[in-house]
């Protein structure tokens, strides 16, 4: 890079850091109580506006009760089980507030279609009109009240590396008559982050009582019960609010949730699982392009530093990056390392799950190139592997909806769309020159080498992959 380019990049970087520091230091105190709640309650809310240096950073911030400003007074719900059985089609699980010790559900504004957005968590946050907060101590009672209504539901959990076509698959599923899909409900990531922090602190010799650890996460049995109950509530909301009452539900989970995938299937033993992935260098480049708004100059500056990412969300990229196995890697803790470690760690988890629990992991394994080659054929094969009978030619299928899902950019209109397409615009492959070269490939192999001799590079393939 020439001196002017370097100067411009440094100026942009410093500006971003200043904005983030300002954002962090001007954050207003939370208007919500930070003490344990004994009774369920509802309260009208309006979404807060987030001020971020890059819009794409919103995808790194977990949903929380503090996303909203409370309006009016809260209303106590004396019999929350009966309330949810009657109005559960209106409220969807949003997050968990560990300080109030409640599961947070939201009711959207009238007429909002939360599943029309490529990311369910984002649609929930932007359209919330009211919250329902259920004490964790009462969650089992609420789940039991509706469990029989959704006992027949078939869950499908999609685990993935990110940037691999998983959003497209959820759009296709939602276009069918046989199943519905939810793209990245954030409550599972909230649980994953809490479990990760607990594990990391425990490795440093701290016991749960000294961590302020949520009691529900103090042992596997209660954690599994929490997951089961959350899924039950989500199933009830989705089935009862769906005009066709489709009872096969695909849950596309965020990347880090693979860390407790074994707990997910212990909570829901009948669930089917899918793993979707892509070449590690391609995943990293695609993420960088979206995050940095296609600026190669910023990529060159940021690849050796997390900068504002560390300030905004210090734990996100450390799910795998703080693994002691990577202690000998050059530039450990820097930006490119963290992204590479995220992919390598995810793939190692997937490989281990396949070997340890082949009955549960995975019923279908999809590589990005298969979708690029033939979306419809690959999707059809995935449905077959999951035991679902589906054909776009079957009576009752909306061929226009399916064609739209196949043709349009599934992330258009969101900040994670690397090409900044608007909703409804068609997808097209990126033909611009690559950011990742020989140096990145060699460094990627160095990161891979730390995990052993199984994953040798970014082009590693799992057994049974549809390519």
What positions do the PLM features span?
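Glycine-rich phosphate-binding P-loop
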Residues: 156-176
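Intrinsically disordered, low-complexity, charge-dense segments enriched in Lys/Arg
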Residues: 211-253
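Pre-Walker A (Motif I) flank of P-loop NTPase domains
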Residues: 153-155, 246
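Short, hydrophobic/aromatic alpha-helical segments in well-folded domains
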Residues: 157, 168, 233, 260-263
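PAPS-dependent sulfotransferases, especially Golgi type II membrane carbohydrate sulfotransferases
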Residues: 1-147, 315-337, 344-367, 372-467
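Post-Walker A helix-loop "phosphate-sensing" segment adjacent to the P-loop in P-loop NTPases
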Residues: 175-183
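P-loop NTPase catalytic core of nucleic-acid-dependent motor ATPases
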Residues: 149-151
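PAPS-dependent sulfotransferase catalytic domain
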Residues: 22, 26-29, 46, 187-218, ...
């Amino acid at each position: 890079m020439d001196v002017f380019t370097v100067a411009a990049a440094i100026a942009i970087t410093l500006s971003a850091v200043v904005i983030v520091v300002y954002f962090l230091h001007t954050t207003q105190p939370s208007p919500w109580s930070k003490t344990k709640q004994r009774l369920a309650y509802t309260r009208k809310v309006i979404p807060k506006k987030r001020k971020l240096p890059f819009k794409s950073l919103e995808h790194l911030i977990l949903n929380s009760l503090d996303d909203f400003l409370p309006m009016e007074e809260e209303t106590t719900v004396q019999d929350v089980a009966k309330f949810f059985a009657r109005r559960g089609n209106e409220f969807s699980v949003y997050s968990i507030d560990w300080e109030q010790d409640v599961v947070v559900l939201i009711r959207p504004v009238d007429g909002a279609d939360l599943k029309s957005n490529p990311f369910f968590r984002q649609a929930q946050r932007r359209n919330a009109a009211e919250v329902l907060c259920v004490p964790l101590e009462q969650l089992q009672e609420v789940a039991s009240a509706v469990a029989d209504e959704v006992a027949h539901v078939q869950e499908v959990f999609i685990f993935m590396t990110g940037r691999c076509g998983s959003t497209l698959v959820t759009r296709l599923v939602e276009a069918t008559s046989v199943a519905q899909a939810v793209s990245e409900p954030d409550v599972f990531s909230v649980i994953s982050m809490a479990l990760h922090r607990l594990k990391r602190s425990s490795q440093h010799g701290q016991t749960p009582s000294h961590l302020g650890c949520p009691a529900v996460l103090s042992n596997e049995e209660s954690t599994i019960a929490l997951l089961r109950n959350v899924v039950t509530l989500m199933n009830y909301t989705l089935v009862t609010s769906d005009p066709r009452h489709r009872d096969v539900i695909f849950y596309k989970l965020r990347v880090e949730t693979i860390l407790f995938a074994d707990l997910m299937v212990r909570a829901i033993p009948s669930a089917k699982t899918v793993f979707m992935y892509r070449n590690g260098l391609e995943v990293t480049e695609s993420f960088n392009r979206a995050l940095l708004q296609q600026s190669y100059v910023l990529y060159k500056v940021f690849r050796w530093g997390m900068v504002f990412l560390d300030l905004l969300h210090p734990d996100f990229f450390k799910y795998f990056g703080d693994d002691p196995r990577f202690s000998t890697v050059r530039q450990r803790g820097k930006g490119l390392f963290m992204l590479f470690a995220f992919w390598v760690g995810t793939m190692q988890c997937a490989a281990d799950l396949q070997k340890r629990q082949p009955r549960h992991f995975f019923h279908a394994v999809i590589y990005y190139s298969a979708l690029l080659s033939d979306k419809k054929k690959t999707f059809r094969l995935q449905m077959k592997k999951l035991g679902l009978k589906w054909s776009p030619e079957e009576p009752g299928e909306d061929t226009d909806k399916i064609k739209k899902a196949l043709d349009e950019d599934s992330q258009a209109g969101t900040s994670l769309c690397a090409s900044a397409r608007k909703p409804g615009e068609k997808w097209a492959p990126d033909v611009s020159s690559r950011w990742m070269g020989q140096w990145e490939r060699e460094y990627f192999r160095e990161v891979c080498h730390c995990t052993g001799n199984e994953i040798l590079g970014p082009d590693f393939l799992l057994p049974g992959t549809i390519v």
